[in-house]
């Protein structure tokens, strides 16, 4: 018997050959389906070649089946007639699409900067706009998970910055923050953080890893090692620093929780989103990951 799989050659066995084409991920087919969904919803893809390349990156590196969220304004967004951002689309499905939300009186519209390929987000004490996923998302399944992204702090004379991540019980539980503060007391292109395993019985201790140098849109990734209580920070393909190990020996286990992805500030216990002023360019979340994923993800945008 001659067994041939997807070669185009005749099969001479006693049973028909298995057609595995439906189970083989094809970046071009995934992109075509995604584009059809975006266009049908009234959106557009400013950078179609880049979007297709991102599907290729996820598929070819074995990340597609482990990704819960992947979005970049240049890879899909919808704006209204005045240019206000309504939606930033999730490459992994509509449930993760980022929908515009607001509180109070926003100081300025939330718009897309085509040059920076980023959405500008500001929230003050008076109000503002933010982006929040359509539904709750899985944060992690394995003992190690990953966040990666690129953002920019747009005003260096305040103490705000911009945060992307998952919030539970009024706390940022898995997040990326970019911040440079007045007087340069904080200069972080990226900070990845969570709480230790004393949460949820208590608030838990804050665990974080950050760079001490600021620049806009720096490619980075945070590898959250739940079982050993450490976050590893990667930048441009290299491990830059690990966090101080948690006092409990583990990070907070979020595997039984789902919550929206929020980009802007932190959603507090009263459901108010905290102040921010920055720009969001790209974000990727893997529910299960390892060091090789962090190396690759921290090079996105280079």
What do these predicted regions represent?
Residues 70-72, 146-150, 161-163:
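Active-site-flanking beta-strand signature of metal-NTP-handling nucleotidyl enzymes
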Residues 101-125, 136-138, 146-156, 172-250:
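Extracellular glycan-interaction surfaces
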Residues 156-163, 171-172, 262-265, 280-282:
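Exposed, interaction-prone regions of secreted/extracellular proteins
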Residues 221-223, 267, 284:
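A structural signal for beta-strand register positions
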């Amino acid at each position: 018997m001659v067994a041939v799989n997807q070669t185009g050659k005749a099969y001479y066995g006693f049973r028909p050959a298995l057609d595995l084409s439906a189970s083989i991920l094809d970046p071009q087919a995934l992109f075509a389906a995604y584009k059809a969904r975006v266009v049908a919803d009234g959106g557009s893809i400013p950078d179609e070649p880049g979007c297709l390349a991102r599907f290729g990156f996820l598929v070819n590196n074995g990340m597609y089946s482990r990704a819960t969220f992947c979005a970049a304004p240049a890879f899909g967004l919808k704006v209204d007639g005045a240019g206000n951002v309504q939606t930033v689309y999730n490459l992994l499905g509509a449930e993760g699409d980022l929908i515009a939300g607001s509180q109070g009186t926003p100081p300025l519209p939330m718009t897309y900067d085509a040059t920076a390929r980023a959405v500008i987000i500001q929230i003050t004490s008076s109000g503002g706009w933010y982006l929040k996923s359509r539904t709750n998302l899985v944060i992690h399944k394995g003992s190690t998970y990953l966040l990666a992204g690129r953002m920019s702090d747009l005003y260096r004379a305040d103490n705000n910055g911009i945060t992307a991540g998952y919030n539970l019980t009024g706390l940022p539980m898995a997040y990326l923050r970019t911040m440079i503060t007045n007087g340069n007391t904080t200069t972080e292109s990226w900070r990845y953080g969570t709480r230790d395993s004393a949460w949820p019985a208590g608030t838990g201790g804050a665990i974080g890893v950050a760079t001490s140098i600021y620049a806009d849109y720096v490619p980075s990734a945070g590898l959250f090692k739940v079982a050993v209580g450490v976050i590893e920070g990667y930048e441009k393909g290299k491990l830059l620093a690990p966090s101080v190990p948690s006092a409990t020996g583990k990070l907070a286990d979020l595997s039984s929780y789902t919550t929206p992805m929020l980009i802007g500030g932190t959603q507090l216990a009263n459901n108010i989103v905290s102040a921010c002023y920055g720009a969001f360019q790209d974000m990727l979340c893997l529910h299960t990951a390892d060091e090789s994923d962090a190396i690759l993800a921290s090079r996105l945008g280079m």
